[in-house]
């Protein structure tokens, strides 16, 4: 007879995922064992194995759950307004707000997704691409001059860089609130994007490709 599922099964699973994310962020995925996770969660190894067969399954669930929440929140934010500038700010604000209390999950996403087998990486990378596509579309709508791929991709990833690494310096109660930082990033991007795109356009075609001999030197 199959073992019945406890009423608090989902709550315990979420706790295991969050605590495991903290442990992975602190000690690294490779340096964290199932024993460490069980001790960190204050549960027996037997109970931990009732939820997950190995730490690879835990890592996948941490990332899948984290990215699903981000995608759902950003998709909702993307539909809240048709004003291009407001739409961009709303998306940036939503991302920063979703990162609240999820620093560990976010660090694990950056550092450990690549440690999963390729077949398990694919659905997670697909979720990441959804986020990238939504932000890129919002940037292009807010500043049409950056819509060319040569400019849009670097700009999109630059914005993600400002948001994804904020946990290294941002402190609640510090110089800026999350809302203020979201406004700061939005204004910075809107003010500088057009000039940056124009500079790239002016330089486009001016640089000659390296000779074959020089290419060999560079390689």
Roles of regions detected by a PLM:
Residues 87, 100-119, 168-169:
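Amphipathic alpha-helical segments used for helix-helix packing
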Residues 2, 15, 19, 23-57, ...:
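Helix-turn-helix
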Residues 107-111, 148, 171, 200-202:
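Short, hydrophobic secondary-structure boundary micro-motifs
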Residues 1, 97, 101, 132-141, ...:
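C-terminal peripheral helix-coil segments that are non-catalytic and often amphipathic
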């Amino acid at each position: 007879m199959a073992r019945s599922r406890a009423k608090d099964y989902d709550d315990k699973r979420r706790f295991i995922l969050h605590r495991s994310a903290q442990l992975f962020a602190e000690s690294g995925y490779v340096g964290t064992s199932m024993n460490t996770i069980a001790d960190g969660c204050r549960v027996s190894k037997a109970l931990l194995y009732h939820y997950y067969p190995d730490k690879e399954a835990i890592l996948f669930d941490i990332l899948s759950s984290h990215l699903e929440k981000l995608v759902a929140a950003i998709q909702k934010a993307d539909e809240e307004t048709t004003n291009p500038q407001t739409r961009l700010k709303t998306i940036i604000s939503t991302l920063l707000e979703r990162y609240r209390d999820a620093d560990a999950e976010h660090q694990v996403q950056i550092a450990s997704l690549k440690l999963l087998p390729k077949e398990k990486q694919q659905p997670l990378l697909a979720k990441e691409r959804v986020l990238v596509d939504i932000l890129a579309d919002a940037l292009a709508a807010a500043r049409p001059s950056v819509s060319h791929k040569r400019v849009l991709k670097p700009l999109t990833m630059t914005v993600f860089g400002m948001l994804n690494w904020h946990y290294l310096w941002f402190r609640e109660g510090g110089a800026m609130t999350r809302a203020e930082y979201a406004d700061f990033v939005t204004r910075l991007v809107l003010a500088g994007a057009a000039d940056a795109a124009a500079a790239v356009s002016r330089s486009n075609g001016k640089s000659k490709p390296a000779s074959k001999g020089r290419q060999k030197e560079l390689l």
